[in-house]
Each structure stands twice: as C-alpha cells, then as structure tokens.
C-alpha cells in the first residue's frame, strides 16, 4: 500500500510538472526592464498545440489586459511587442506579466510567464563593486623615481663612453698595415 501511494504521488507530481512545462518562455528574463518606445521579443519553446496567443497584462489583482498578440501559428515561436506610452498610465514604472494561452479548441489553460517592468526611461543597470580608494605607498613612489633616475644615468654614461672612445676602438684589417703606418710617420 505504501509503495502504491508513493508511485501514485510520483505519477501525479510528474504529470503536474509536465503540464507546467508544456509552455516554457525563453525571453524575457524575470524582472526585465522594458522602456517606452523600444521593441522587445517574447520567445518561447515550441508548444505541442497548433496555435497560441501571447498577452501582456498588468500584474495587479485584476489581471487587466494591456495588449495581445492575436492567434500565432505553432511554427512561429516569437512575438515582437513595442512598448506604448499609454500602457504606463501616466506613471514612471509599472509591473506587467507575460501570459500564454494555447489555442487547442477546448478550455485553454493560461500559462503565466515572467514579470517585466514597464518603464518610462531606459537605463543600464550597472553593479559596481566598490573597493576602498586606491592609496599610493610613499616608499613605492620614491623607489619608482630613484630607479628611473638611476637607470637613466647608467644609460647616459654608457652612451658617453661609447662616443668618447670611438677613435681608440678602431679595428685594423691586419697587423702589417699597422706597422707600415707607424713606420711612415717616423
């Protein structure tokens, strides 16, 4: 008896999950921000029904309809919606919900999708990790100045020695030329 109840419960929960997973939204993400005047796409995985209707409704207790897509054939898995100013009802922000109603000829089930925030303006939401102000260690600053001055002086000394001893560093082709040149001078 215990085994039968456990397997029956498993089958019921599996059926509930299958019914809930029948219609799955891909976009928008939960709590997305949709700005007035912009066009957004509502995408979903292809359902088993022939036709589907997607709607945007206010997330209040009345579930007032904002706009609807009309009947969409099953081979189309997106709906483009442009946010209108009158949907905001003279407010700055308002929460809406995307819903789907598969049209299968019988009593249709309403599948509730993600909530979106309809907004009057568009902005990027940036999350900035605030770290403490960057402080320069005075020893590091002195070390950087000292190293750069010291290396510059070394380079200048090497260049000076290179150009100052240029005549003494000549390489002669062979030793006889050296002897001949010193013999003629005497």
UniProtKB/Swiss-Prot annotation:
One of its GO terms (cellular component) is membrane. It is found in: Membrane. Residues 1-21 form the signal peptide. Keywords: Glycoprotein, Membrane, Signal, Transmembrane, Transmembrane helix. InterPro entries: Pma1. The keyword Cell cycle does not apply. GO terms for biological process: endoplasmic reticulum to Golgi vesicle-mediated transport. Its main location: membrane. Disulfide bonds: none annotated. Residues 164-186 are cytoplasmic. Pfam families: Psg1 (PF14610). It is a single-pass type I membrane protein. The chain crosses the membrane at residues 143-163. Residues 22-142 are extracellular. Glycans are attached at residues 62, 75, 93, 104. It comes from the Eukaryota. This is Uncharacterized protein C21C3.17c.
